[in-house]
């Protein structure tokens, strides 16, 4: 009897414990979990049928699946520039965010040297292009047009001077000194003569062979006009040329022999003497001009 009573108490205690656990609040199970638990409780035959049906739906039309995969590979071409991406459709939000992060990361890790070199190349290319295509006349065309609005006469003089100097420069580059002298005599422009004569003077001082005695004789009328000018710069250019001619041909000019092979020496001596009789007053001019005139006068006095 005692044992039966003990067993009854034990059974009642266990029932209370079970009731207690049953009454405890349980964690809410989702519908998906309940559905899976129900499917697990299915019979083996039902489970096998379910598996076959599910697999059949997945494997259904494998050609279509391969076609989709092929199209996806065809769209995503590898680009040379990893930071350039074709804009994707709005439906792929996650992929867009990932691609945008990759683009920002790639842009952040680009070498600074490459960026500097490209910028330098652009700057250099732009500088070289402007230097090759733009001439000085086209570069300052706006400035010239603005200045010439109220100075049309001066603009014409400068244009004419520039054109004549270009012609003289063409003769000089060809080393056609006789043609250059003939051109200077024909235009009778003392401004162009003043620009060209110092070059010929340097050639005489360096004893260049392409400056002949005949060219020097032909230039004497222009030099006489320079010595009569009211501009001291013109006078200095003429005196420097006279000094160079006398020193270059001094051995022939100072020769006492009556037989002279070149007749231009006699012509040059006579013209120099007649020219200096009219312009010997230049020795009274103070400064650099008077010093050159005194040196020329000292040479010409020995010829009398």
UniProtKB/Swiss-Prot annotation:
Annotated organism of origin: Homo sapiens
Q: Does the keyword Kinase apply?
A: no
Which GO biological-process labels does this protein carry? cytoplasmic microtubule organization; positive regulation of cytoskeleton organization
Q: Where is this motif: Nuclear localization signal 2?
A: 72-79
User: How is this protein annotated for GO cellular component?
Assistant: cleavage furrow; cytoplasm; katanin complex; microtubule cytoskeleton; midbody; mitotic spindle; mitotic spindle pole; nucleolus
> What protein does this entry describe?
KATNB1-like protein 1
Q: Which UniProt keywords apply?
A: Cytoplasm, Cytoskeleton, Nucleus, Phosphoprotein
Protein's cellular compartments: Nucleus; Cytoplasm, Cytoskeleton, Spindle pole
Instruction: Please describe, based on the UniProt annotation, the reported consequence of changing residue 11 to A.
Output: Complete redistribution from the nucleus to the cytoplasm
Positions bearing Phosphoserine: 61
- A Pfam family matched in the record: Katanin_con80
Motif, Nuclear localization signal 1: chain positions: 26-33
